[in-house]
Amino acid sequence: LLEKGIPELTMLEIAAKLKISLRTLYEIAPSKENLILFTVNNILNKIGKKAQIKIENIHSPFQKLEIYLKTVNKAVGPKFDIYIKDLNKIKNSKGMIDYHEGYITSFIEKLLIESIAAKEIKEIDTSAYAILLGGIGRDFATKKNKKKILKSPEETANSITDVILAAIKLEQ
């Protein structure tokens, strides 16, 4: 429904398309905005879970970091554009997005610390790098910045991430 334009539909029309009662829909989400936030939150949780699954059997913290970042950068890819394009117009969306970015940033910092301990990367300010790497996709996904970059926010974030990771990686 989000792909087809939930903002254009009434709650009654959404309930009919989902084949549920209006009462049930209001129990799930008291408004269209809450329904959109609920849906986007679930999408972001699925991306995060997929990222965790992809790295669970990898031993190298640095390889985990590379794979994790590529996976979570999908949240700003073209496939998810429809979900996030008007998200900033919805009250409370910033808090939800900040929560996900905070989780990602914390996990990235953990992997950076583990990478230093494993002597896979240089000694760096892990907090600063985690903040940068955790928010890079979001920065490129803004309307203002999207117009300035040549590729999608996901491709651009991955490209810049590769440069940053190459700069801190120790030669084995």
Name the predicted role of every residue range.
Residues 67-95, 142:
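Amphipathic alpha-helical segments used for helix-helix packing
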